[in-house]
């Protein structure tokens, strides 16, 4: 029996089976081939979607807008300055109104409860473009990128180095548990995922053959690693005052050539972006002036090296988001 997720919301990969996740990855690969070959795929010309952004974005916004237009849909973008949500109108009321006008709603913001309430009250598919807890669309792009490199992902080891409490690390643990992979969170003990989420993922892993490991030992994290993953050390919405403490805690987990040498020779490097790998940003230069380090979570030589796949990964955001929209709206 084929996979059918029409009409469903995409809030967290905990809600999806391994078969459904693999279906979305394979569908994204097909859309990628179609776009590369110039094959038109305006399959949803009668649909309209709205993008709600409480947090800024480059890749997520562009991926949703281009993906929607490739499918023939109309797109409306709303940010806090151009909507009343939560200010003069309740979230529930906003959701009900948007559900009358649009066929699908994307939300990128802070609380996971907001995207869940949008799905509860709107009556249309809602897609999580990022919350403080989860980043599920990023995971599909990550897994497509890894699958392009390795084929079957079962048994492959992915290690996240850094602040393993964040939305990306949470979501990586979920998707790896679903796909029968070996997930390792490698970072300071005080920056590990919540026990509740770990328990949920371990329960999934017991069914899929996946493995969940938490460690503060870089050598353990890097050993036999196929996919080296990191993210910035302070997430969106967190105060800049956290930099000093985070740098002290996380500098030992910086992805550099020495760490990459401990992984498998064929290992790839992934990063959800943006990255502070040099001094070419205002933040990067400020960090250099304050702390004397030219790079943070990943060094420039790794970021620009032959094992780096983060720009393939970024492109794959578009193809995977397109797959999610199509599969839930077709």
Tell what function each PLM region has.
Residues 203-299:
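Rossmann-like adenosine-cofactor binding region
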Residues 53-66, 148-231, 236-238:
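Glycine-rich phosphate/diphosphate-binding loop of Rossmann-like nucleotide-binding domains
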Residues 98, 118, 220-221, 302:
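Structural alpha-helical scaffold elements that stabilize or flank donor/cofactor-binding regions
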Residues 1-16:
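Generic N-terminal amphipathic, Lys/Arg-enriched alpha-helix
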Residues 71, 101, 121-122, 179, ...:
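Short, structured coil segments at secondary-structure junctions
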Residues 286-330:
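C-terminal helix-to-coil terminal segments
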Residues 36-38, 42-147, 277:
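Phosphate/diphosphate ligand-binding glycine-rich loop within oxidoreductases
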